[in-house]
Amino acid sequence: MEFSVKSGSPEKQRSACIVVGVFEPRRLSPIAEQLDKISDGYISALLRRGELEGKVGQTLLLHHVPNILSERILLIGCGKERELDERQYKQVIQKTINTLNDTGSMEAVCFLTELHVKGRNTYWKVRQAVETSKEALYSFDQLKSNKVEPRRPLRKLVFNVPTRRELTSGERAIQHGLAVAAGVKAAKDLGNMPPNICNAAYLASQARQLADAYSKNITTRVIGEQQMKELGMNAYLAVGQGSQNESLMSVIEYKGNPDAEARPIVLVGKGVTFDTGGISLKPGEAMDEMKYDMCGAASVYGVMRMVAELNLPLNVVGVLAGCENMPGGRAYRPGDVLTTMSGQTVEVLNTDAEGRLVLCDALTYVERFDPEVVIDVATLTGACVIALGHHISGLLSNHNPLAHELIGASEQAGDRAWRLPMADEYQDQLESNFADMANIGGRPGGAITAACFLARFTRKYNWAHLDVAGTAWRSGKAKGATGRPVALLSQFLLNRAGLNGDD
C-alpha cells in the first residue's frame, strides 16, 4: 500500500473517501466541523439523530454528502477528546484501515493525523499511522495450500498534516515507519515459521540473504559448532547437543558510521528454534508455541533490516544465537558442569533454563567488538510473564543511562518496557556447591536471577537485557508472533542516529 502526506482543506479533496474523527458525546472534530459547515449541517444532523456516539472505534460511512467533492466520508469515533492517548489513537487507525478495506475504498485521505494526541507531534502521529496500518494488514499464509486472498482494495492512503511546513516531517515519518514496519514483518515471519523449517541453518540463510541484499553496508559470517568448540563456547554447544540440527551463530555486521572505527552497538538475540526443555522436558500442552523461543533472534534480524533500509549512520552488530534444545542420548543433563567461554563454570540444575547458557557465551563472544553498548533480547523466563503479563517487556541493565534510554525509546515507540531491579542480593540465589554458579536461582524473582546470571558475563561493557517472554507472541485465536521489540530497538537506534522526529 502506498502512503503519502499532503496539507490541504477537506472541502477541496477529490477522493474516494475522507476520514475524520468524532468525539464523545457526538462532538465533531475541527476537520469534521469544517465539512459539516460546507454541507449545511448534514453531518451534525445525523449525529443528533443518534447515528454515531463517538466511542472509540465506532464508524459511520456517509455517501454523497451535500457540497462535498469526495464520494464518501468515513466518520470514526475517537472517544473523549481530552482523553485521546497513544493506545486509543492506534486503535482508531487500525479500525480505519479495516473499515476502508471492508467498504471497498481504493484510496482515501485521512485527517486523523491532525487530531491532538497528548504529548505527540505530527511525525509521531504519521509514523504510528503507517506502522499500525501495516500491522492491520499483516497475515501469514505462506504454508497454506489454499490461500484465501483477503479483500484489501485499499491501495493509497494520504495523511493530511495541519501546515505545509510539516510536510517534510510527515514524509520522514512515512520513510521511518515503513522501514520499522518491514523489520517487524520480517521478525514476525521468522517467528511464525515452523521449527521443521526454521532451524539454526535457516536463520543463518536469512542472515546471509540480508548481507546479499544490502552488500554495501552489511557482512554476515556464520560460526558453526567446530569453531564454537575452538572458542570454548561449551555452554552454548551443550544446549544443542541433543539435536540433529547443528547449532549456528550468525554474526551480522552493519557499518554505516562515517568513522569506520566507531564502536558498535551490539544486539544479541536468543535463537532457540524449538525448546522442548531438553531432559527437563516441558509439559505437552502448548509446546508448539516453543517455536517462538527464537523470537529474540528474529527481532534482532528485523532491526538489522531496518538499520540497513534507512542507511543509519551507526555501526551495529546483530548476533543470532541459533540452536535447538532437544532430549536425546547426547543431550546435556541436570547435574552437568559446563565451562563457559569466559572460563566461569556453571552447574546445570535444569536443562529448560537453556537460553541463558546460549546467551552467556554469545555475550562473551561480543567482547571482541569493543562495543559501545550491548543489548540482548530473549524469550527468557516464564517468571517475567507472571511479573508483567503480556503487555510490557522486562528490562534489566548494569548501566542506568542505557536503561533510561531504552525506557524512553519504548515510550516513544509504543513498545513498552519496564525496568526490574537487579540488586546484588539476588546473586546469592545462584550459588552452587560444585561450580561458580548454578543456571537457575529458584522460583522467587526468576526473571531477575536470570538477568543476574547474564550480568556475570557482561562486566566489560554497558549492557541491557530485554526479556520478551510475555510480549514476543500471542496465544489463542490470534496466535502468532508480534514482532516485538523491533519497534523499541528501532526507536533506540533512530535516537542514537539523531533521527528521533523532533521538529
Swiss-Prot record:
Tell me where it mainly resides.
Answer: cytoplasm
Instruction: Spell out the catalytic residues.
Output: 282, 356
Catalytic activity, per the record? Release of an N-terminal amino acid, Xaa-|-Yaa-, in which Xaa is preferably Leu, but may be other amino acids including Pro although not Arg or Lys, and Yaa may be Pro. Amino acid amides and methyl esters are also readily hydrolyzed, but rates on arylamides are exceedingly low; Release of an N-terminal amino acid, preferentially leucine, but not glutamic or aspartic acids
Q: Which UniProt keywords apply?
A: Aminopeptidase, Cytoplasm, Hydrolase, Manganese, Metal-binding, Protease
| Record CDD domains | Peptidase_M17
Work out whether the entry's keyword set contains Metal-binding: yes
One GO-annotated biological process of the protein: proteolysis
* Record text on cofactor binding: Binds 2 manganese ions per subunit.
GO CC, sorted alphabetically, is: cytoplasm
Provide the binding site for Mn(2+) 1.
Answer: 275, 352, 354
Q: What is its EC number?
A: 3.4.11.1, 3.4.11.10
Q: Which cofactor does it need?
A: Mn(2+)
Give the InterPro entries listed for this entry: Leucine_aapep/pepB (IPR011356), Macro_dom-like (IPR043472), Peptidase_M17_C (IPR000819), Peptidase_M17_leu_NH2_pept (IPR023042), Peptidase_M17_N (IPR008283)
User: Can you say where in the cell this protein is located?
Assistant: Cytoplasm
Q: Where does Mn(2+) 2 bind?
A: 270, 275, 293, 354
Q: Which family does it belong to?
A: Belongs to the peptidase M17 family.
The function of this protein is: Presumably involved in the processing and regular turnover of intracellular proteins. Catalyzes the removal of unsubstituted N-terminal amino acids from various peptides.
This chain belongs to which protein, by name? Probable cytosol aminopeptidase
The protein's organism comes out as: Erwinia tasmaniensis (strain DSM 17950 / CFBP 7177 / CIP 109463 / NCPPB 4357 / Et1/99)
Annotated gene? pepA
